[in-house]
A protein has these predicted regions:
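Alpha-helix C-capping/helix-to-loop hinge sites
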Residues: 29, 45, 49, 62-65, ...
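Amphipathic alpha-helical segments within well-ordered protein domains
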Residues: 10, 40-43, 79
Length: 126
């Protein structure tokens, strides 16, 4: 199972330098888990940068994976991770979703570098 965080989705949709690193887990829709917080973050950023039509296309592609909403158990797991690891709320919800589902978290967010169960792809310098 795989979770791609918002930075990975945005890199993929922008066809950025690391897009190919995220293409595999994104293409494997049967094993793709999509936390609802990533829908929010990607829609908002795409709306700002490309407009509503493009943002809706991005979210439609994301919804081909299995969406996971936040319930009480996930919220509490995320809060504990946030406290223990000093992560922002969205990051802790994404990491908690991956861990609850036994999934690998794919990201280029350096907040996750070196964490267990995380495939961290550094952003190119420059």
């Amino acid at each position: 199972m795989n979770v791609v965080d918002s930075s990975g989705w945005l890199e993929y949709f922008a066809d950025g330098p690391n897009a190919d690193d995220f293409a595999g887990p994104i293409a494997d829709r049967a094993n793709l888990i999509v936390p609802v917080i990533t829908l929010y973050e990607v829609f908002k950023r795409s709306l700002q940068q490309q407009g509503e039509e493009a943002a809706r296309v991005c979210v439609a592609a994301m919804q081909e994976g299995r969406g996971v909403e936040v319930d009480a158990d996930l919220a509490l797991s995320a809060a504990k991770l946030s406290f223990d690891l000093k992560l922002p709320m969205a990051d802790s919800l994404i990491l908690a979703t991956a861990r609850v589902h036994g999934a690998t978290l794919w990201t280029q967010d350096d907040d996750f570098a070196g964490m267990s169960g995380v495939r961290y792809i550094p952003k190119p310098k420059g």
